[in-house]
Amino acid sequence: MDYLKTVVPSQLMAERGANLVVINPGSSNVRIGFASQDVPFNIPHCIARHITQQKDDTPRLSVRDKMLNCHATPSQNAERERAYDIIASLLKIPFLDEDMPSANQALPPKMGRVDALSSQQNKDDSKFTWTDVMDRSIKSSTPIVDKDADVDPLQRSTPDDTEPNSEENMYKEIIFGEDALKIPPSESYCLSHPIRRGHFNISQDYSLHQVLEDLRTIWNWILTEKLHINPRDRHLYSAILVLGETFDNREIKEMLSIVLCDLGFSTAVIHQEALAAAFGNGLSTSCVVNIGAQVTQVVCVEDGVALPHTALALPYGGDDISRCLLWVQRRHCTWPNFQTDPVNKPIDMLMLNKLKESYSQIRSGSFDAVSVVHSYEHEKSVGHQKTKLSALNVPPMGLLYPRVLVPEEYPPPPRSWFQDYDDMLEDTWQTSDSLYSSGNGGFGMWDNYPMFPTRLKKFDNIGLVEAIVSSILSTGRIELQRKLFCSIQLVGGTASTAGLAPVLEQRVLNTIPSNQPIEKAEVLQSRSYPLFVPWKGGVILGVLDIGRDAWIHREDWAKNGVHIGSGRKYRDSYFLQAQAMCYYNS
């Protein structure tokens, strides 16, 4: 303890971080890296497998995600247009029907095609190239032997009787990351996202076994290809799982089993994403607002402990804002005549995300921009068109008025998924901690939580401002509420949206009931890129955890399963906060 009070943070990171791997999985991306790194690898959380087509079938890319409603219903469209007009009045921009072209106007002038672009315009970030799905390394029938003696069992080839230089094996069997999102639509691949809307993406067409296999394969590929950790050496490393509050107990168990039993880490620990985000910014008390790609979570943290009754989940995020951007342009008749389909063509979602990150912001008044939009209808002809994007300040306002977003609905896991009878957490969460005083840690952060349906409150149509106010007021103590209203912390990729923080400050303060003696609301500026704050917090918690009471060993997990923790707060939470502040101030 005395050593930690005097050690230089950079030295501590070098000593303790080299053999720690921090994993922060999300619905759209997974962030993985060594604790000694400044920033993690941020890789799309997906996998594409080559599928064999029947002779009569037309080769095509299939997306395994099964949405309940891929298109908005007429009532949803009506609500969306009303929400747009509300936003338009607040931002002082024209309503939808005030900015439409006349009937005799074939194409607005802003949609003129551009045949020649300047060198600067050619550098547009929204342009992507198709993934080459052919395995160029296969040139003969001689088997390719890996330079390492140990072969990773997760990446062994399956059929021994197939010629390596056959036409079928010329295709890459598995494609990961962004390359998987850029596979041409005419290629025979099945694209899968194992996590959607903060849960395992289980459906009738995507079984639990397949979800776990894909998670294992994706993480193994990142560890091998990006972090260069040989499978035979993984027993020398420990893993820190930074998990969002949306995951239920069984999903947490399965991911822990993947890390310890399948990937081969010697020990592992789990930290809540909200708690890690607070420590990632050097705080021990904060209202953490995590705006992810598909889920927004609001959780209050007090003295290094996430308060379970304050946790809220909102089923929308950055991806919904990107799709709303497309809808707004089409309603304004500014989008080119391209078959842009972010649901069925992942490369279109990549383009929309780039446009959103480049142009969307919250500000008053008309806000337009000229950009080059690309068409990815066919891999042999990638067209482009220069267009004027209109009302770019409307889509991010969907965080405050979610009816303008109309998010896709992913089917929840079947009810039998929650019947995990060997999970003691679901049976003992109301039991006194004194009964388990001899517990050796493990799930200490979760063992006071009920099972998922009552642990996390979900709201479909409330805005982010109402969620923040509701979460903070649910704490019930005025002094704590004042601290939390002055310590609102935005994390996640969408948290970087220009103009979001001041709008939230003003609207949160105006939404607080008049009978509450609260005079101030403040959104704190993030100390680093908001997307990586929870990951960095996991690094700090892992490096500074000297006792490792909650760490689980691979042998213990395989033999005994769930360990009941002590349910206590961090005994040294204030000390951890001081160390975190020291780390950032050095």
Swiss-Prot record:
GO terms under cellular component: Ino80 complex
UniProt cross-references to InterPro entries, sorted A to Z: Actin, ATPase_NBD
One Pfam family it belongs to: Actin
Top-level taxon: Eukaryota
Residue segments, region Disordered: 141-169
GO BP terms in the entry: double-strand break repair; regulation of DNA-templated transcription
Family annotation (SUPFAM superfamilies): Actin-like ATPase domain
UniProt family annotation: Belongs to the actin family. ARP8 subfamily.
Name this protein carries in UniProt: Actin-related protein 9
